[in-house]
Structure formats: structure tokens, C-alpha cells
Amino acid sequence: MERQGLDLGLSLGLGLTTAATWPAAGFCLNSGMAEQEVIRRDDVVAATAAEDERFACSPGSPVSSGSGKRGSGSGSGDEVDDAGCDVGGGGARKKLRLSKDQAAVLEECFKTHHTLTPKQKVALAKSLNLRPRQVEVWFQNRRARTKLKQTEVDCEHLKRWCDQLADDNRRLHKELAELRALKATPTPPAAAPPLTTLTMCLSCKRVANAGVPSPAAAIFPGHPQFLCGFRDHAGAASSSYGGASSGLAKAVRAAR
């Protein structure tokens, strides 16, 4: 009985001991795995950094393309960046001067296509004895200059249009102020109709209304006295002519 109890106690003690030692062993195992993971991760980071540096130094990499794009804004059309890169950071960038023939061929190609496919880029670089990267940089510079010129033209056009709109706005404001001033001033009263003028006929001794002319005045409106005198003279002449004719008739009868 005592032996069984001793064995049971021993087994229980061993079980507790092993149970107590398992977390420590697991912790040590986890620590070792974590250290190995950290070391492995550092190796991967170092290898990735080295690969990135080599990739950045290659002529056709996007990183060097971006650096060429940043440096291309101040370059002329006949210069391209000859991207030379040193892993240690001591490399200097130099510019390659293009000949007139090379620049002319590139300009003609740019008139046809503003962007080139990789095959076109390689073929054009081979025909001009250049590297594909140099052709790519030249096209990037040319597109940037074209966009800048178009922006300047658009800005000048918008500036003129803005000045014209400002002049029209000032003119409309002036016309509106004049219309408001005319509306605010009181209107003068309506003018009275002209008075009717009367003229005196000296021969007829009658008062004639100048607004309603007589038939004789309608024929000769400017000579009322002449008409009256003409009528008087005509009457006198007719009476004298009639008297003379009657006397002549009497003399003829007496002779008979």
C-alpha cells in the first residue's frame, strides 16, 4: 500500500514536473524560431536592397526613368541623359549630345508617334546608334516640352478672353447705371399744342383761318392779296369791256 502510494506520488510529481517544464521548453523553442526568423528576414531585406540597387542602376529601370524625367525638364532637345549609376552612390550623370541627323530623325518619328512601343524603341535606337534608354528619355523630354508650350498657349488665350469679359462687364455696368439714371429723372410735362394763327385779307376785309384754307388759298396759299386784287381787277375789266361792247352795239344800230 505504501509502495503504491509512493509510486503514485512519484508519477504525480513527474507529471507536474513535466507539465511545469513544457512552457519553458516551448518558450525556448519559440525564442529560437523567432531569432532564426529575424535573421532570415534580415537576410531577405539585405538581398532585396541589393537587388533594388542593381535594378535602379540598370538603363531600362523605372527608377532611372523617373530620375531621367526629373532631370529632363532643364535639358535641351538635342541632349539626353546618359544614365550611369554607381552602386556606392558616387556615379555622376552625363548628357549625350545628339547630332543634327539624329535629332531630325527623332523629330520626324515624334510627329508620327508621340509614344513608342518597345520594338519601335529598339529599332529606332539601333538605326541611330543609340541605346533604347536614350531614345526613351528624348521622347519624354519632347512630350514635356510640347505639353508646356500648349499650356502657355492656352494660358495666353484664357488671359485674352478674361480681359475681353472684363471689358464687356464694365460696359454693361455703365449702361445699367445710365438706364437707372434715366429712370430716376422726372419726365417733363407734355408740350401744349400751338395756337391757331389768324390772317387778315386786306382786299376782302375778311378774317380767314390759317388752319382751314379757303379754296382760293388752297390753290395759291401764299398770295391771298394777289387773288383778291386779281378778282377785283378782273371784275373791273369785265365791266369796262362789257360797257364798251354795249356802246359799240348801240352805234351799229344807229348807223343802220
Swiss-Prot record:
Organism name: Oryza sativa subsp. indica (Rice)
Segments for region (Leucine-zipper): 149-193
Highest taxon above the source species: Eukaryota
Gene Ontology MF annotations: DNA-binding transcription factor activity, RNA polymerase II-specific; sequence-specific DNA binding
DNA-binding stretch(es), residue numbering of this chain: 91-150
Name of the protein: Homeobox-leucine zipper protein HOX28
Annotated family: Belongs to the HD-ZIP homeobox family. Class II subfamily.
Key words of the record: DNA-binding, Homeobox, Nucleus, Transcription, Transcription regulation
Tissues where the protein occurs: Expressed in seedlings, roots, stems and panicles.
Sequence ranges of Low complexity compositional bias: 58-67
Gene behind this protein: HOX28
Region annotation Disordered: where it falls in the sequence: 56-86
Stated role: Probable transcription factor.
Location(s), subcellular: Nucleus
GO cellular component, as recorded: nucleus
